[in-house]
């Protein structure tokens, strides 16, 4: 068995199946488990996905939000057990895979148009 096949076999059991389809430009609500002292609690981080990176077990995504007038970005592993769930709030229409230009934008220029979804 090749090394690549062995890695895929080991990580296949750790991949999550409850991840919704989302991409850059979508607004998501991430329910992340955080540890404060001895207790764990769920912290909700809601913002725009500015990038997705990688594939398989090492895939990540970065979410950006504005908190008290300051831009906050947080990168989450896609298949992390520390993320309880991911909710897609709205689907954005963008023409780029990486939305780094949103870092310089504020106010109305940072808005993203909603993608139309046919049912």
UniProtKB/Swiss-Prot annotation:
Q: Which GO terms describe its molecular function?
A: structural constituent of ribosome
Alphabetized, the UniProt keywords read:
Ribonucleoprotein, Ribosomal protein
Give one Pfam family: Ribosomal_L19
This protein's GO cellular component annotations are:
cytosolic large ribosomal subunit
GO BP terms, alphabetized: translation
**UniProt keyword annotation of Nucleotide-binding present:** no
NCBIfam families reported in the protein's UniProt record:
rplS_bact (TIGR01024)
Functionally, this protein is described as follows: This protein is located at the 30S-50S ribosomal subunit interface and may play a role in the structure and function of the aminoacyl-tRNA binding site.
User: In which family does this protein belong, per the annotation?
Assistant: Belongs to the bacterial ribosomal protein bL19 family.
Identify the HAMAP family for this entry.
Answer: Ribosomal_bL19
Can you name this protein?
Large ribosomal subunit protein bL19
Write down the species. Answer: Limosilactobacillus fermentum (strain NBRC 3956 / LMG 18251)
Q: Which gene encodes it?
A: rplS
């Amino acid at each position: 068995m090749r090394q690549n096949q062995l890695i895929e076999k080991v990580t296949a059991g750790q991949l999550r199946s409850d991840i919704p389809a989302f991409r850059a430009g979508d607004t998501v609500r991430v329910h992340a488990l955080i540890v404060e002292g001895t207790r764990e609690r769920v912290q909700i981080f809601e913002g725009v996905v500015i990038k997705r990176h990688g594939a398989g077990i090492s895939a990540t995504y970065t979410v950006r939000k504005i908190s008290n007038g300051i831009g906050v970005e947080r990168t989450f592993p896609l298949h992390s057990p520390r993320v309880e769930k991911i909710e897609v709030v709205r689907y954005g229409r963008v023409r780029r895979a990486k939305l780094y230009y949103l870092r310089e934008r504020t106010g109305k220029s940072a808005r993203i148009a909603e993608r139309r979804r046919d049912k």
